[in-house]
Amino acid sequence: MSGTTESQLNQLVGAMHLRHRFLGVFDKTFPGFLDPNRPASAIVNTGSRATGGMHWIAFAFDPIARKCYMFDPFGWSDRELWNLYKVKYDAFLRRTGLRQPDKCFELVRSVEAVQCPCSAACGLFSALFIASFDRYHTRPMDGNPIIDTVVGVKHSDMYKPEFQSILHRNQERMYFWFMKNNSFFRAHESELKRETAINSVPENH
């Protein structure tokens, strides 16, 4: 198989000993952030459990800043997410907003790719973002030593060989970060690298 499983991601994140509340790993029916006063995060799949899932995305909520972060390793737009995976997140974002005193919050989303389209490592990249949010909740998207392990590439460049080499290096740097900082990754290094390897996803996936 290619990619990380729900169980692997739960154990990987569990080994981080987070200071905020990690709600868990969900399929596309994720209910949202329903506690308006507590920082929280989740890893959400664009597919359903019944179909085995498709693509992992990380979400995090900062109640003080009233911001919800959406970290997609490919940085797809809403339209691209719908075209590729037939998924929308309007419902859970609406439920999150309804819990706010004035029913408002800011959605901050990634807009560049850090993962190569040939890679099955979206779950690992999502977990890296969870670690970034935990340590640097005011700037989890960039400008901190965890998320800056990887470099963003514009969508228009992500299929070009010279930029794919950057994305491939991102994956190697991410592996190195987990090796240094995560006991579950160290214990299952060979398996996780094999299942998320570069060139493990068919072209034009």
Curated annotation (Swiss-Prot):
Top enzyme class: hydrolase
Keywords in UniProt for this one? Autocatalytic cleavage, Disulfide bond, DNA-binding, Host nucleus, Hydrolase, Late protein, Protease, Thiol protease, Virion
Show the catalytic activity.
Cleaves proteins of the adenovirus and its host cell at two consensus sites: -Yaa-Xaa-Gly-Gly-|-Xaa- and -Yaa-Xaa-Gly-Xaa-|-Gly- (in which Yaa is Met, Ile or Leu, and Xaa is any amino acid)
Activity regulation information from UniProt = Requires DNA and protease cofactor for maximal activation. Inside nascent virions, becomes partially activated by binding to the viral DNA, allowing it to cleave the cofactor that binds to the protease and fully activates it. Actin, like the viral protease cofactor, seems to act as a cofactor in the cleavage of cytokeratin 18 and of actin itself.
Gene Ontology MF terms: cysteine-type endopeptidase activity; DNA binding
Induction statement: Expressed in the late phase of the viral replicative cycle.
Q: Which GO terms describe its cellular component?
A: host cell nucleus; virion component
Q: Sorted alphabetically, which InterPro entries does this protein's record hold?
A: Papain-like_cys_pep_sf, Peptidase_C5
Q: Where is this site: Cleavage?
A: G52, G53
Q: Which residues constitute the catalytic centre? A: H55, D72, C122
Lineage top rank: taxon: Viruses
The listed locations are: Virion; Host nucleus
Q: What is this enzyme's EC?
A: 3.4.22.39
Q: Name one GO biological process term.
A: proteolysis
Q: How does it assemble?
A: Interacts with protease cofactor pVI-C; this interaction is necessary for protease activation.
Its function, per the record, reads:
Cleaves viral precursor proteins (pTP, pIIIa, pVI, pVII, pVIII, and pX) inside newly assembled particles giving rise to mature virions. Protease complexed to its cofactor slides along the viral DNA to specifically locate and cleave the viral precursors. Mature virions have a weakened organization compared to the unmature virions, thereby facilitating subsequent uncoating. Without maturation, the particle lacks infectivity and is unable to uncoat. Late in adenovirus infection, in the cytoplasm, may participate in the cytoskeleton destruction. Cleaves host cell cytoskeletal keratins K7 and K18.
Protein name per UniProt: Protease
Gene name of the encoded protein: L3
